[in-house]
């Protein structure tokens, strides 16, 4: 299942970029996190690679901005998605997070 998802991404890597540019976070989440649904054997992998890292990076970012200065942060797309993504985690801590488009 995970290999199938990766193969789809490899077949058309531009689709990920296009989806990100268009703000299609639902499509991205389906592509990146779809293998997790109905496959408990992937849960620990996703916990380690994405969700625990998101928590740790959120802690670091919260500390980084305590001085009140604006920051520009770049992260991989998968860390930006869904309710366990870094923007959502920062919002739960009272931060204002906005998506910036290069277009």
What are these model-derived regions, one by one?
Residues 1-66, 85:
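Hydrophobic, often amphipathic alpha-helical segments used for membrane interaction and targeting
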Residues 68-70:
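Short coil/turn segments at beta-strand junctions that form active-site/ligand-binding loops
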Residues 72-103:
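C-terminal structured interaction module
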């Amino acid at each position: 299942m995970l290999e199938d998802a990766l193969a789809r991404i490899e077949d058309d890597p531009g689709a990920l970029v296009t989806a990100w540019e268009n703000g299609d976070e639902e499509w991205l989440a389906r592509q990146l996190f779809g293998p997790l649904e109905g496959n408990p054997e992937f849960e620990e992998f996703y916990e380690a690679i994405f969700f625990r890292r998101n928590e740790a990076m959120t802690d670091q970012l919260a500390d980084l901005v305590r001085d009140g200065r604006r920051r520009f942060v770049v992260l991989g797309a998968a860390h930006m998605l869904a309710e366990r993504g870094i923007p959502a985690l920062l919002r739960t801590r009272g931060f204002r997070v906005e998506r910036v488009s290069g277009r």
